[in-house]
UniProtKB/Swiss-Prot annotation:
The lineage of its organism: Bacteria, Pseudomonadati, Pseudomonadota, Gammaproteobacteria, Enterobacterales. GO terms for molecular function: ATP binding; heptose 7-phosphate kinase activity; heptose-1-phosphate adenylyltransferase activity; phosphotransferase activity, alcohol group as acceptor. This is Bifunctional protein HldE. Keywords: ATP-binding, Carbohydrate metabolism, Kinase, Multifunctional enzyme, Nucleotide-binding, Nucleotidyltransferase, Transferase. Residues 1-318 are annotated as: Ribokinase.
């Protein structure tokens, strides 16, 4: 199965928020200053990049979507540099110039890939009349599919409720990257995207995923939100929606060099994907993949369609990830030529929880490659009832494929994967639960081929059914 990128070229997004210019001075450090105990940096490279709301717009435009940027600037060199740089990447700027204030600028001095100091040049824009911003939003609502409010608490978003109201009346979703602990000002937004520390500053410290989900659902109810996405660094992302199971997505970052601007990338990709007509779950998947790319770069950065496609399909392109049966057979044949032991398991994996992750990690340790066969939606419905699955097949496979322990993911339509297993003939077939080996679908075929069959225990206290019951109970309160 292939995962296609959204039709970004059809997506229109307006970004309103705190615009700033990020300046970078680079150079070697070879001595300590005689004037003070500080390093001397011999600057040999200077870079200027759009930051804050401007970086969000850059991320949207870099995907090929139509990005419009509205914000407050001064009348100075920094504003002109921003306009020039953004125009070069097809961001349509409509700044409100405030002659009494400088454009917000942040200067970073770096040496040997280390940031030595940051200098901020700014005066807050609080007190500036927001009406020109409202007028620009109104003018664009008929031609955009999403509105992003990028809040860095610098004064551009003092009238958030008016902006949310304008967009919601026009049927345009509002995505907000929040700042501070006053979430009341974001009431009625479609989606908030706090990082974990921002979330816990409002909801309180969470000792477990269950507690995070419970407190997140309370925030959704308290502030009339449609959804909440908590970005959790190395723990990935968690999407919460009323009356839906939580969607936990593991991180896809391979190496982390700099998290500067990663939140801008996440909300930019979310908005562009939604504006292209995709679901929120799909938008989170692409945003998670993009975040994994951008943290591997230094400074505020963007993600191109090619980079995003490689991140999404990278494992499949190299013989791993979500696959068709034919692709899987070829991948297994190649693995066997390399002398690798192939392990296979199967299940619905509707709401991925810690028990699933632990079970799959243990299964992977038994061999060199792990195949996970997943029941289709129709198969799940026959097996679990009309209310299942909670998450459709493509989303279940995407999440499984993102796990480090899983090499290949494939689906099957039948009630059991017996036919699929007979075609693959893994070296080891494993199943979790209270089964006897001879009761496991495909066991006879695997044994006949000289393979092994094994039963693994699930982690106690983890159950998809219990999670669903808890969500239903909480929603009825």
């Amino acid at each position: 199965m292939k995962v296609n990128l959204p039709a970004f070229e059809r997506a229109g997004v307006m970004v309103v928020g705190d615009v700033m210019l990020d300046r970078y001075w680079y150079g070697p450090t070879c001595r300590i200053s005689p004037e003070a105990p500080v390093p001397v940096v011999k600057v040999n490279t200077v870079e200027e990049r759009p930051g804050g709301a401007a970086n969000v717009a850059m991320n949207i435009a870099s995907l090929g979507a139509n990005a419009r940027l509205v914000g407050l600037t001064g009348i100075d060199d920094a504003a002109r540099a921003l306009s020039k740089t953004l125009a070069e990447v097809n961001v349509k700027c409509d700044f409100v110039s405030v002659p009494t204030h400088p454009t917000i600028t942040k200067l970073r001095v770096l040496s040997r890939n280390q940031q030595l100091i940051r200098l901020d040049f700014e005066e807050g824009f609080e007190g500036v009349d927001p009406q020109p911003l409202h007028e620009r939003i109104n003018q664009a609502l008929g031609s955009i599919g999403a509105l992003v409010l990028s809040d860095y608490a610098k004064g551009a978003l003092t009238s958030v409720q008016t902006m949310i109201s304008l967009a919601r009346q026009a049927g345009v979703p509002v995505l907000i990257d929040p700042k501070g602990t006053d979430f009341e000002r974001y009431r009625g937004a479609t989606l908030l995207t706090p990082n974990l520390s921002e979330f816990e500053a409002v909801a309180g410290k969470c000792k477990s995923e269950d507690e995070l989900v419970e407190r997140g659902m309370k925030l959704i109810a308290d502030y009339d939100l449609s959804a909440l996405l908590v970005t959790r660094s190395e723990q990935g992302m968690t999407l919460l929606q009323p009356n839906k199971a939580p969607l936990h997505m593991p991180t896809q970052a391979q190496e982390v060099y700099d998290v500067t601007g990663a939140g801008d990338t996440v909300i930019g990709v979310l908005a562009a994907t939604l504006a292209a007509g995709n679901t929120l779950e799909e938008a989170c998947y692409f945003a998670n993949a993009a975040a994994g790319v951008v943290v591997g770069k230094l400074g505020t950065s963007t993600v191109s369609p090619i980079e995003l496609e490689n991140a999404v399909r990278g494992r499949a392109d190299t013989g791993f990830g979500v696959m068709t049966e034919e692709e899987l057979r070829q991948a297994v044949a190649s693995a066997r030529k390399r002398g690798e032991k192939v392990v296979m398991t199967n299940g619905v994996f509707d709401i991925l929880h810690a028990g699933h992750v632990s079970y799959l990690a243990n299964a992977r340790k038994l061999g060199d490659r792990l195949i996970v066969a997943v029941n289709s939606d129709a198969s799940t419905k026959r097996l679990k009832g009309d209310s299942r699955p909670v998450n459709p097949l493509e989303q279940r496979m995407i999440v499984l494929g993102a796990l480090e322990s899983v090499d290949w993911v494939v689906s099957f339509e039948e009630d059991t994967p017996q036919r699929l297993i007979a075609g693959i003939l893994p070296d080891l077939l494993v199943k979790g639960g209270d089964y006897k080996p001879e009761e496991i679908a495909g066991s006879e075929e695997v044994w006949a081929n000289g393979g092994e069959v094994m039963v693994l225990n699930f982690e106690d206290g983890c159950s998809t059914t219990n999670i669903i019951k808890k969500i239903q109970t909480e929603s009825e309160k």
